[in-house]
Regions:
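N-terminal secretory signal peptides that target proteins for export/translocation
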Residues: 1-7
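Compositional signal for N-terminal targeting/processing segments
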Residues: 2, 13, 17, 26-346
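Membrane-interface helix-boundary signature
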Residues: 8-12
Length: 346
């Protein structure tokens, strides 16, 4: 009888232990972010569980360019990061000049009608920039969203717009006559070909040989011209390394050169403002931490700038959350469907 009671008691204890173990495992899986999360693009539901690192300072998201569903997701994600995580810097995958003009717009120093058509490619872009502009209105400078172009991919149209805008309201009278004539020519230039083939090369030469004359005119704005022209020259070098093909070749010298430039630019941006929180939106191939094959193509960049930012020697020291580029291949398949749910793999 005692043996029977003992066995019955032991079975109860085993069952209680097993039940407790199952409950514990269920809680772990429920509370810890899983390998896939469902994100509702219309409400942002699920975003908080996706972003598992509360102490992250830089969030980098992969994308498929010009996909409507991706852009909706990006907008929801960015607004969430601004409102809940304190992100205040948007890193864009284009050159310094483009980022500068975009930033002037959302700071409400430049009207949307002046330049927005040059860098807006969709309604979703327009809505995001309008939202940032309204968010910044009447806020102190240290709480405003800013935009920085981190890439080396400015168009000649945007660089011309940038130069004209930078020279607006400048006094040329203290510079020498050669500099005055060059800057007046840029201000009045209406032909893109003339700017690209004549005025821009002269401006680059002036920056290299007589930068002090430009600084007399630009003052504190000189740093913006230096960075925009450096990015343009890097873009020319990249095009040359790519044999002037329209698309960069995976595994080629041009791709490696661009990744080096992106990493260096992001390191400089971060080091100039090391306490800010950042969100970056870049092509999926730059962001992927694992190989992905879609449509028979390997979407992967060896030694991409994001993998270096996530590495042990990174200037970020572990303060990075990567939203893998794989997610946007999933979104890309939905851009003609009625659903606003995607599955995020992280």
């Amino acid at each position: 009888m005692k043996a029977s009671q003992y066995n019955s008691s032991l079975r109860k204890k085993v069952l209680i232990f097993a039940a407790a173990l199952v409950l514990l495992i269920a809680l772990v899986f429920e509370l810890y972010p899983r390998s896939s999360q469902i994100i509702d693009l219309s409400t942002g539901s699920g975003l908080s569980r996706m972003l598992r690192y509360d102490d992250a300072q830089v969030y980098i998201c992969g994308e498929i360019h010009r996909k409507v569903e991706y852009q909706k997701f990006r907008n929801v994600l960015f607004k969430y990061l601004v409102e809940k995580k304190g992100v205040r810097v948007l890193l864009m995958e284009h050159g310094y000049a483009s980022g500068f003009i975009e930033n002037e717009t959302i700071q409400n120093r430049m009207t949307f009608s002046d330049a927005f058509d040059q860098f807006t490619i969709s309604q979703e872009d327009y809505e995001l920039f309008r939202w940032m502009s309204e968010f910044n209105r009447n806020r102190p400078d240290n709480d405003k969203i800013s935009i920085v172009g981190a890439d080396i991919t400015d168009s000649i149209e945007m660089l011309c717009t940038f130069c004209k805008y930078l020279l607006k309201d400048c006094d040329f009278s203290a510079a020498d006559r050669k500099t005055q004539m060059l800057l007046i020519g840029i201000q009045k230039c209406r032909l893109q070909q003339r700017f690209q083939n004549s005025l821009l090369p002269q401006l680059i030469e002036q920056m290299q040989t007589q930068p002090e004359q430009l600084e007399i005119v630009l003052g504190d704005k000189m740093i913006h011209l230096e960075r925009a022209l450096l990015g343009w020259q890097q873009e020319l070098t990249c095009n040359e390394l790519n044999d002037y093909q329209a698309e960069l070749q995976f595994g080629g010298k041009a791709m490696a050169y661009r990744e080096d430039a992106l990493y260096a630019n992001l390191r400089r941006i971060y080091q100039e403002n090391p306490t800010a929180k950042y969100f970056g939106s870049f092509g999926a191939a730059h962001v992927q931490m694992t190989r992905y094959v879609g449509d028979g193509t390997v979407h992967w960049i060896d030694n991409c700038f994001v993998s270096r930012m996530a590495g042990e020697e990174s200037f970020l020291d572990g303060k990075l959350t990567v939203i893998d580029g794989d997610v946007t291949h999933e979104i890309g398949n939905l851009d003609e469907s009625d659903t606003n749910h995607i599955i995020l793999y992280n």
